[in-house]
């Protein structure tokens, strides 16, 4: 094959990846989307000169197709911050480096071996793990997320999390690739029909066995028979670029109350409102002085059981002289600092000595709610999105905080971007959360695939934890999600709405909740180990060649 054919084959990979992520409706395409990349890598490896064990060309063949995929699926992030224009280019470069590193290890440990492609799965899993934990955390395109609109096919995420989906996708691609090789490469063609049939059977099994197991679990799963709670979800539909910050806090509360009153009754346990719903910027040490909280408490007390949970922008005063990464100084006192925060608050019903609970958003959006590598990139702060006064790095909690009431189940409240991190949501459940509420403000991305993908991810969090979810979006998609990941009562984009449903709290802990991202952790460890060993092997081979050269 010449360069043009190899380039077209690799471009096919980019097209397939983009198609699979097109509103996540064609997710099964992911099971073959990396086959073109493996074909190109195999051809390059088979045609390398004897003196050159690896080639940098593979990076170049990967970059443009991966850029196409990243651009077509995440272009909408640029609506929230101009810095995100660079995101697809950086992401594509990082992914191409991952593919190149896998090629490097494959050539070191398993040249021309069928099992050598396992390094692609290993390094991609390690890359996804990195994307969950470094400063530029962007796990959006973690491969396992692609099946979020097919919860019936990934019920086993309760054991593996999204990492299991990524591993499955790579195993399917590897099996299909070996089948394709039987028709593409001469050496494999000569092995005959029996060899082809074996690979056909293997590819079929790798694809269908996990799907079959998942479907059996889908149809046989039963929720625990616990006492249900009634949840009302409010979608006020405030334009985040104008209404939400142009309206007075009282006007915002009036809209919330007007909608909630349509569904709330004497049996209502929770009224869930979206992220950044309250805009008083109250001091957290004096939270009850917030006019919005007092106003909503008056409404809350009209219903005997109701508790209101809402998102709020707040300020946290730091002890004298203490300065954190998110600290901001007072103009008149350079030794006093405070943090701006994005919080969820559970409004206390007690009107005499109220003690409302709160927690801080802790998985922050890069370049919007935190400045990654602040000591180096701090000068870019002016390009970050101004979230109505909370621009820059926000204060956060060191660990997950669960809301508890005497007569109600413990609840987890995930704020927007936090719902993309399965292990973090699992930490709430491990601490006793029996229900999950997701509050978000997806209007920043406008009417793009972004808000639909974000809503779909809630299904994966439900499967991983086996918890029912109520999702409140300022605008976007508000809905309820069963522990099987099945969504209901979905609202339309850019419309005011209120929905109500009975949810059954669940108490059992899944294997994934108990053990977290064990697949990611193991993959990261082995990826680093094999890469370092490959480097050592490469140096030793060069040294041996120098020794045997004639003087």
Regions found by a protein language model. Give the residues of each.
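A generic fold-level signal
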Residues: 151, 226, 303, 332, ...
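Soluble catalytic regions of membrane-associated enzymes that act on cell-envelope
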Residues: 215-367, 402-407, 413, 417, ...
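Active-site catalytic loop in hydrolytic enzyme cores
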Residues: 77-80, 130-162, 329-422
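Conserved hydrophobic/aromatic beta-strand scaffold that supports enzyme active sites
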Residues: 18-21, 100, 233, 344-346, ...
């Amino acid at each position: 094959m010449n360069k043009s054919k190899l380039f077209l084959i690799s471009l096919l990979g980019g097209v397939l990846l983009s198609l699979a992520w097109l509103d996540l409706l064609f997710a099964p395409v992911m099971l073959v989307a990396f086959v073109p990349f493996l074909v190109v890598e195999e051809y390059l490896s088979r045609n390398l000169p004897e003196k050159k064990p690896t080639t940098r060309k593979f990076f170049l063949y990967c970059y443009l197709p991966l850029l196409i995929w990243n651009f077509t699926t995440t272009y909408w992030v640029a609506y929230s911050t101009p810095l995100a224009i660079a995101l697809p280019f950086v992401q594509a470069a990082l992914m191409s480096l991952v593919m190149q590193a896998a090629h490097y290890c494959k050539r070191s440990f398993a040249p021309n071996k069928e099992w050598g492609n396992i390094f692609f799965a290993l390094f991609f899993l390690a890359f996804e793990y990195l994307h969950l934990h470094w400063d530029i955390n962007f796990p959006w395109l973690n491969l396992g997320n692609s099946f979020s609109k097919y919860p019936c096919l990934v019920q086993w995420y309760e054991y593996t999390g999204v990492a299991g989906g990524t591993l499955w996708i790579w195993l399917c691609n590897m099996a299909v690739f070996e089948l394709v090789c039987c028709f593409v490469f001469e050496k494999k063609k000569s092995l005959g029909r029996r060899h082809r049939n074996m690979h056909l059977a293997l590819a079929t099994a790798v694809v269908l066995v996990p799907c079959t197991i998942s479907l059996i679990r889908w149809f046989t799963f039963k929720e625990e028979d616990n006492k249900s709670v009634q949840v009302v979800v409010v979608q006020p539909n405030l334009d985040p670029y104008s209404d939400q910050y142009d309206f007075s806090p009282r006007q915002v509360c009036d809209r919330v109350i007007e909608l909630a009153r349509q569904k709330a009754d004497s049996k209502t346990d929770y009224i869930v409102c979206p992220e950044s719903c309250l805009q008083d910027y109250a001091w957290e040490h004096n939270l009850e002085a917030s006019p919005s909280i007092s106003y909503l408490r008056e409404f809350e007390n009209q219903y005997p059981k109701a508790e209101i949970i809402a998102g709020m922008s707040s300020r946290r005063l730091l002890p004298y002289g203490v300065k954190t990464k998110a600290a901001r100084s007072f103009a008149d006192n350079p030794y006093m600092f405070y943090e701006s925060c994005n919080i969820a608050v559970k409004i206390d019903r007690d009107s005499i000595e109220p003690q409302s609970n709160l927690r801080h958003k802790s998985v922050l959006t890069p370049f919007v709610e935190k400045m990654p590598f602040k000591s180096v990139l701090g000068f870019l702060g002016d390009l970050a999105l101004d979230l109505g006064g909370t621009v820059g790095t926000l204060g956060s909690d060191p660990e997950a905080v669960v809301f508890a009431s005497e007569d109600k189940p413990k609840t987890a409240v995930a704020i927007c971007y936090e719902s993309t991190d399965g292990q973090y949501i699992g930490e709430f459940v491990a601490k006793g959360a029996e229900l999950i509420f997701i509050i978000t403000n997806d209007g920043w991305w406008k009417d793009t695939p972004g808000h639909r993908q974000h809503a779909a991810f809630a299904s994966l969090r439900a499967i991983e934890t086996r918890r029912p979810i109520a999702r409140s979006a300022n605008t976007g998609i508000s809905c309820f999600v069963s522990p099987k990941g099945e969504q209901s009562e979905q609202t339309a984009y850019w419309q005011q709405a209120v929905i109500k449903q009975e949810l059954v709290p669940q108490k059992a802990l899944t294997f994934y909740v108990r053990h977290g991202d064990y697949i990611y952790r193991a993959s990261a460890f082995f990826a680093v180990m094999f890469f370092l060993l490959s480097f050592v092997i490469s140096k030793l081979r060069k040294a041996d060649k120098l020794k045997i050269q004639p003087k």
